[in-house]
Amino acid sequence: MTITPQEALQRTIEHREIFHDEMLHLMRLIMRGDMSPVMAAAIITGLRVKKETIGEIAAAATVMREFANHVEVQDNSNFVDIVGTGGDGSHTFNISTASMFVTAAAGAKVAKHGNRGVSSKSGSADVLEALGVNIDLQSDQVAASIAETGMGFMFAPNHHPAMKNIAAVRRELGVRTIFNILGPLTNPAGAPNQLMGVFHPDLVGIQVRVMQRLGAQHVLVVYGKDGMDEVSLGAATLVGELRDGKVHEYEIHPEDFGLQMVSNRTLKVENADESRTMMLGALDNQPSVAREIVTLNAGTALYAANVAESIADGIQLAREAIASGKARAKVDELVRFTQQFKR
């Protein structure tokens, strides 16, 4: 039985759950542009106020995946997405993007799904452009990039065209809604493994269980207790891990891996060019907090990708990838490969 938008709104006002099939129906209306902007705004705000459930988020992500332009990847082994929800307000350089190069250099395949900066001074798309990467690729070109270089960047607007039907509503509302947490759940290449950073501690347990429902294989959802949507050097990090169908939640500390706890203040940047400079310094093996946090996050991603047996092993592989120059070489490789498709 379908639900009308008005009934769904009433449900959110009463703090009652919208069931799976109902949420599928509502989300399809939104993605097709068949729901009025007023009703769409009211429902997504109502969901936020009552707090979205795991079931509601999983259903919404299922529909977003349905409407996406998919990237077909033949070999799913050691295939990982490194992504953050953003919105953590930390204004750091692009740690997950830097980690992509290290993770690929150490033997994983990385499908990075990202956008321009919204809350940050530099989104993943902005810094990749500053590096010289052509981000405007078709789905088959992204697939070729993953096969050839071990990395592919999927610029979100190219892969989620239906999002234009809710873009104006989201912009005018100006508050976080369910759509802020759907991006990391809707990788167009369907990477079965993931390192996902989130902007709130409550989302660690929620997002990892959403990924469990969506059939993911090995996922680590992380929240740095200093507010970062990354594995942090400045505080303990909360982890929700999905492996072999089971969820475990725990805390990790930099000292667990022989790293020094140090403030993330030195990682702040004002724009994409500053982010590019800091990233290249880390990949060039210049001793810095930037290098250490990239090593930590890439090591965690290598564990998520099942290249490493543990985060500690992953960190060792990441160190070797940076020290050998392989990680830095991956930047030039991605630039060269993507520029051939420049239109």
From Swiss-Prot:
Recorded superkingdom: Bacteria
Keywords for the protein's UniProt record, in alphabetical order: Amino-acid biosynthesis, Aromatic amino acid biosynthesis, Glycosyltransferase, Magnesium, Metal-binding, Transferase, Tryptophan biosynthesis
Amino-acid positions noted as binding Mg(2+) 1 in the UniProt annotation, renumbered to this chain: S96, E230
Cofactor(s) demanded: Mg(2+)
The enzyme's E.C. designation: 2.4.2.18
Known catalytic reactions: N-(5-phospho-beta-D-ribosyl)anthranilate + diphosphate = 5-phospho-alpha-D-ribose 1-diphosphate + anthranilate
Family annotation (Pfam families): Glycos_trans_3N, Glycos_transf_3
GO biological process terms on file: L-tryptophan biosynthetic process
Pathway linked to the protein: Amino-acid biosynthesis; L-tryptophan biosynthesis; L-tryptophan from chorismate: step 2/5
Binding residues for Mg(2+) 2: D229, E230
SUPFAM superfamilies (UniProt xref): Nucleoside phosphorylase/phosphoribosyltransferase catalytic domain (SSF52418), Nucleoside phosphorylase/phosphoribosyltransferase N-terminal domain (SSF47648)
Binding residue positions for anthranilate 2: R170
Binding note for cofactor: Binds 2 magnesium ions per monomer.
Record-listed 5-phospho-alpha-D-ribose 1-diphosphate binding positions: 84, 87-88, 92, 94-97, 112-120, 124
Any one Gene Ontology molecular-function term assigned to this protein's record: anthranilate phosphoribosyltransferase activity
GO CC annotation terms, alphabetical: cytosol
Assembly, per entry: Homodimer.
NCBIfam families according to UniProt: trpD
Function noted in UniProt: Catalyzes the transfer of the phosphoribosyl group of 5-phosphorylribose-1-pyrophosphate (PRPP) to anthranilate to yield N-(5'-phosphoribosyl)-anthranilate (PRA).
Protein family per UniProt: Belongs to the anthranilate phosphoribosyltransferase family.
HAMAP family documented for this protein: TrpD (MF_00211)
Name of protein: Anthranilate phosphoribosyltransferase
Species the sequence originates in: Burkholderia lata (strain ATCC 17760 / DSM 23089 / LMG 22485 / NCIMB 9086 / R18194 / 383)
